[in-house]
């Protein structure tokens, strides 16, 4: 089947949605950027700039709208809303879609209430659409400014994944296509939780050695869970797995790292900045347990977030686990 994507819609006009609209515009596509809030849409359309990305002008080929039906007419649609709001956004969009329209989830997480991955949510909320997932090491500000970035885009059909990559790729944004949808989703969800752990380590001033150990052992957990779901090794060690983990464990530009940093310092969580890992942690632990997978770092994060254990007690418990061979 031939896929041609000249028009791209982005549903969600936050920083990441606007950055991805810029990506599609640089790739030569005609872009519709949908904002649910009318005032926000007017501000962006009038200033030709998103206040969440100051100093970065919108390309002329980006049209800002509050008309969801207009967005639904695009050849492919990027859904750029938080993971816990994905179902609602897709349900509103579903009746307006042509059969087979690709819906690309651009959130990293697991639906808290159902334990469903992002493409599973899309499949349930819009059965006539074709789900896909975009993930990888990418901060909105870097992407919006046109700094070199590489990500993974996965869909069940390789031809579709390849066509979407061709539609979005440019000299500054390099997507790799894959059919390992679940592997990509697991990498994105797990790294959010591990980034909170990395932030806690940094907030506690436990040192670079501890951060390196945490990141490495956390990655081992990500790999174990991925293998239990049949993920490919090249996905887990690729951009959407190891690559994204490295980025989000590296500094406070990551919302999940920033949340962990605040926890480690004994400060309130950052206001107005959603850290998906807060929702994902308990779900990830339950999914791991259902597959017989040990994830002690993720368990520690979930316990800290729920208030059932202190940070110091969680760290001590991790360090006092039985000694064993590295795997």
Curated annotation (Swiss-Prot):
Ordered alphabetically, the record's keywords are: Cytoplasm, Lipid biosynthesis, Lipid metabolism, NAD, NADP, Nucleotide-binding, Oxidoreductase, Phospholipid biosynthesis, Phospholipid metabolism
Which protein family is named in the record? Belongs to the NAD-dependent glycerol-3-phosphate dehydrogenase family.
Reactions it catalyzes: sn-glycerol 3-phosphate + NAD(+) = dihydroxyacetone phosphate + NADH + H(+); sn-glycerol 3-phosphate + NADP(+) = dihydroxyacetone phosphate + NADPH + H(+)
The UniProt entry, under HAMAP family, shows:
NAD_Glyc3P_dehydrog
The cross-references to SUPFAM superfamilies, in alphabetical order and at most eight, read: 6-phosphogluconate dehydrogenase C-terminal domain-like, NAD(P)-binding Rossmann-fold domains
Q: Which GO biological process annotations does it have?
A: carbohydrate metabolic process; glycerol-3-phosphate biosynthetic process; glycerol-3-phosphate catabolic process; glycerophospholipid metabolic process; phospholipid biosynthetic process
PROSITE patterns, A to Z: NAD_G3PDH
Q: Lipid metabolism among the record's keywords?
A: yes
Report what the protein is called: Glycerol-3-phosphate dehydrogenase [NAD(P)+]
Q: Where is the active site?
A: 191 (proton acceptor)
| A GO molecular-function annotation | glycerol-3-phosphate dehydrogenase [NAD(P)+] activity
Give the binding site residues for sn-glycerol 3-phosphate: 108, 136, 138, 191, 244, 254-256
- Record-annotated residues binding NADPH? 16, 36, 108, 140, 255, 274, 276
Enzyme Commission number(s) from the entry? 1.1.1.94
Its lineage reads: Bacteria, Pseudomonadati, Pseudomonadota, Alphaproteobacteria, Hyphomicrobiales
Pathway per its UniProt entry is: Membrane lipid metabolism; glycerophospholipid metabolism
Q: Say yes or no: keyword NADP present.
A: yes
One cellular component term (GO) for this entry is: cytosol
Localization per record? Cytoplasm
As for what it does, the entry says: Catalyzes the reduction of the glycolytic intermediate dihydroxyacetone phosphate (DHAP) to sn-glycerol 3-phosphate (G3P), the key precursor for phospholipid synthesis.
Q: What is its main location?
A: cytoplasm
